[in-house]
Amino acid sequence: MLAFFNEAAMLNHLYRFMTLCETNGGFAYEPLKPVAFFPGTFDPFSAGHKRIVEEIVLRGFEVYLAVDEFSWSKRTLAKLLRRQIVSMSAASLPDVYLFPDEIPVNLAVPDDLKTLAGLFCDRELYIVAGSDVILNASAYRQSGPGTAATCNHILLSRVDAAHAGDPRRAEDILKGKVVSLSLPAYYESASSTQIRDYIDKDMDIGMLVDPVVQD
């Protein structure tokens, strides 16, 4: 009997709500935000990474963070551990989400980029990449429709000491819209390489990562 009255009360409130929506208008939804996609990172999620995400959110973007499986060129942590670090570091940030593992995205494969764009129909999609990556990654040496260089980008200005004399500019390679972003020198120095070195030497990494993932 109690369940009957509970259901009746619920239906009564639901009916009133639907009536109010019909008479006063429905919900007013805000326009969908543009999407910023972080391609897979092989590194521990540093304080610099988090600061970049915070700045992008402040500029009105919805951020998706992907975690790649493996890199031959870097000494990586286990994928699930890196994914957990990213999740814990970004948990306090609004409009920041982990990108699903089930949808691999390779910037060098136009079909993957097409699939990515199709996930966010009617929304502007931006890829987040550092200027050093754009100048040196093989994905940006390709030309033609649908390649990485034709996508919109949030460009992170970085000084690459190994290519300091390179006259090329990342902006000249990119064909889509470009939103430029730079970090204070302190956050640039909080690199994943430094984090790994500190861990190997049993040194405190509290200033290099979010405090919630330090242990």
Model-predicted segments: where are they?
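Nucleotidyltransferase catalytic core that binds NTPs
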Residues: M1-D215
